[in-house]
UniProtKB/Swiss-Prot annotation:
It comes from Caenorhabditis elegans. It comes from the Eukaryota. Disulfide bonds: none annotated. Belongs to the CoA-transferase III family. It is an enzyme of class 2 (transferase). Keywords: Transferase. GO terms for molecular function: alpha-methylacyl-CoA racemase activity; transferase activity. Its EC number is 2.-.-.-. This is CaiB/baiF CoA-transferase family protein ZK892.4. One of its GO terms (cellular component) is mitochondrion. The lineage of its organism: Eukaryota, Metazoa, Ecdysozoa, Nematoda, Chromadorea. GO terms for biological process: bile acid metabolic process. The active site is at residue 154.
Amino acid sequence: MYRFLSGIKVVEIAGLAPVPHCGMMLADFGADVTVIDKKNPAIEQRLNRGKTMKQLDLKNPEDIKKVRDLCQTSDVLLDPYRPGTLEKMGLDPSTLWNNNKGLIICKISGYGQTGRMSQETGHDINYVALSGMLPTFSGVNATRPWPPANMLADFAGGGLSAAFGILSAIYARSHNGGKGCLLDCSMTEGVAYLSSFVQHYYDQPNLFTDKYALFSGECPIYRTYKTKDDKFVAVGAVEPKFYQNLFKLLNVDGRDLFVNPGKITEDLESRFLQKTRDKWANIFKGQECCVTPVLDIHEVGSYGQHVDRNSFTKTSSNWIANPSPRVWTQDELAALSSKK
């Protein structure tokens, strides 16, 4: 992995989910990340790839001074706490900027640093719920909204958004006289921003709100199907050329797709139950139908495409994703092209 962020120093106050994920991404691309954690933390931190660990007690004034000293020579401070917590410790922006005007202070919280809910507790499901997106993510026909694991707010709306903000602030610092800033990352707002496409097109009922809308979870050409071995394939045949290929290969009469989608769904369900997931994967290979196997976390790294690109690393229990995006230098790309 190319160390584009080499020379950037980050102080990460240990926390849950979004902050360690953000710190890991920065470390993956070369930043020098120091994690401040207490001895014997209640929760084991596993997103510490490439980081340096430092045990300090943030209730101890001497250790607070050590954090302040670290910030004096660092570029970024990652704050996982409820708004106002670091300020009570004497690690407020004014004090930190007096010692280091270039420090970028990134505060990741559920609802933001201001507003009537800034001090409220919550977790991923709460932030997604308040973003307005939970019903859409659950599907139009769901009997109740269900949370899609804890990835959307914590890691996309939180960690990933914060990393983008930090890199933007580092760039801005090179043009504003070296001044840092405070990044107020609300995970609720991060999910909402992530959902901009949905917001802009929500007035199109055939996309989101009709019973068989394209992204409702029930549309016959955009959903999952069970296979003979009780596994699943994913169908994403949105464009006409793709769903026409799908119907032809499966010998399904798709002329009533938009008139009687329920019947098309039944026909496709029946077809996919006739073979195993992996047999279907081989059948659809190269057929331009947008059909892929649904992989679980224990098998994902051994899938052919992922092996070709070394996308995952095997641990004792799971496959762990390698950093993304992949970087190709001009020389590497030229060498790759010459081999084709």
